């Protein structure tokens, strides 16, 4: 099976001035067609280093896809260096030259000589039309390798690749397989623990493959299988998925690109369950997160940020006796906050966050000690304690996600 390498040319990429989004786009498109990308390479606008990269890439890859370096300036060197490497001439493409000439003429502007370079191609190439710019792309087969040259700007590269390069590449790749992937999302278990639970599967993996990634207070597992048909690949993925669920399914919250807050918000909207929030150490993070989603005004009625004892009492109407006897970092305070915000905002669910963000301790409780209260109309109010680390903002973000998870667990249990 053919292997591909994406070579991004541009010093600005190495300096971090531009993110290499082209490589991600091309890799995803090729994966959908069963073509494996094994290497991403970034090289600056330097002739010698680009030559070295080409030499290395040819030894390990069948398909070399270049992005960038096709423009009119002196540092646009991709086609010149590749032509020299392949011992081929550069020739003018009449169609693109006419496009460039007409563009400048229609605007009564003088075309500089260097703009003509964008219509120059490597001899023997199949020209890839640029529908959104001037620089012509190229598709070339030589010495058992396929070379594809694409412009750097994503607005030009993406349509050129999708409309012209990809169909050619897929038709040439007669041994293509189908690649099928599934993303599983877990909360409440660390990456190291999940990896340990799946260790024997990861060590023995061939097809499908299993990869774990640490996300924002969650763990993502990607299962990828290849087969001759989509049905065969899906069957391989599903078999592995079921074994993962058997081991750690209690921590699974969803699939694909849907985040935990987005999933829970959709569940609340679907069931038309209203919600409000009372926040202390999270200082409005939960409310800011839930407010990100369209249509939220149908179910999110509002909330309160009561950071001090005084505002907990005066605004949220938490009993002074509750705070005096138990402190603000307590089950009793969390429950009362959740009940009161639900009553004051007239909502089905009230959720509260109180605790020690860190790095210092509070009321004898170490940093990272938090309580989340959950009040649901018709059910007993509950409070849940968690102990995290000393990183203040990490604790706040994690608590918010934990709050969404508690709501999801309630909704799953009481359908």
UniProtKB/Swiss-Prot annotation:
Q: At the top level of its lineage, which domain of life is listed?
A: Bacteria
Record's family? Answer: Belongs to the CinA family.
The disulfides recorded in the entry are none
The name this protein carries in UniProt is Putative competence-damage inducible protein
Q: Supply the source organism for this entry.
A: Listeria innocua serovar 6a (strain ATCC BAA-680 / CLIP 11262)
Supply the InterPro entries for this chain. CinA, CinA-like_C, CinA_C, CinA_KH, Competence-induced_CinA, MoaB/Mog-like_dom_sf, MoaB/Mog_dom
């Amino acid at each position: 099976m053919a292997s591909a390498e994406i070579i991004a040319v541009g010093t600005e990429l190495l300096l971090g001035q531009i993110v290499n989004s082209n490589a991600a786009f091309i890799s995803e498109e090729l994966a959908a067609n069963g073509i494996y990308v094994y290497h991403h390479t970034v090289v600056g606008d330097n002739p010698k280093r680009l030559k070295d990269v080409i030499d290395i890439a040819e030894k390990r890859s069948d398909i070399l896809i270049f992005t960038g370096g096709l423009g009119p300036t002196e540092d646009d060197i991709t086609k010149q260096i590749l032509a020299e490497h392949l011992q081929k001439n550069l020739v003018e493409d009449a169609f693109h030259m006419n496009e460039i000439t007409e563009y400048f003429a229609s605007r009564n502007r003088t075309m500089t000589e260097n703009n003509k370079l964008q219509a120059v191609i490597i001899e023997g190439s199949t020209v890839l039309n640029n529908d959104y710019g001037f620089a012509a792309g190229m598709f070339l087969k030589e010495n058992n390798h396929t070379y594809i040259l694409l412009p750097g700007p994503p607005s030009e590269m993406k349509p050129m690749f999708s409309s012209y390069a990809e169909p050619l590449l897929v038709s040439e790749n007669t041994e293509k397989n189908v690649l099928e992937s599934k993303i599983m999302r877990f909360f409440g278990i660390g990456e190291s623990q999940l990896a340990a639970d799946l260790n024997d599967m990861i060590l023995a993996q061939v097809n499908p493959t299993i990869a774990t990634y640490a996300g924002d207070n969650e763990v993502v597992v990607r299962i990828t299988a290849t087969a001759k048909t989509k049905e065969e690949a899906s069957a391989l993925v599903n078999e592995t998925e079921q074994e993962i669920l058997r081991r750690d399914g209690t921590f699974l919250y969803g699939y694909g690109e849907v985040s935990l807050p987005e999933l829970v918000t959709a569940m609340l909207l679907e069931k038309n369950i209203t919600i409000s929030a009372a926040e202390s150490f999270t200082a409005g993070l939960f409310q800011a997160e839930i407010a990100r989603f369209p249509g939220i005004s149908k179910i999110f009625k509002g909330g309160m940020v009561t950071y001090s004892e005084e505002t907990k009492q005066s605004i949220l109407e938490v009993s002074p006796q509750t705070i005096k006897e138990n402190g603000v970092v307590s089950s009793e305070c969390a429950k009362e906050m959740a009940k009161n915000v639900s009553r004051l905002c007239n909502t089905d669910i009230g959720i509260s966050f109180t605790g020690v963000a860190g790095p210092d301790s509070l009321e004898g409780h170490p940093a990272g000690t938090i309580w989340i209260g959950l009040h649901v109309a018709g059910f007993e109010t509950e409070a849940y304690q968690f102990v995290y680390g000393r990183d203040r903002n990490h604790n706040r973000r994690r608590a918010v996600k934990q709050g969404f998870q508690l709501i999801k667990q309630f909704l799953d249990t009481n359908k």
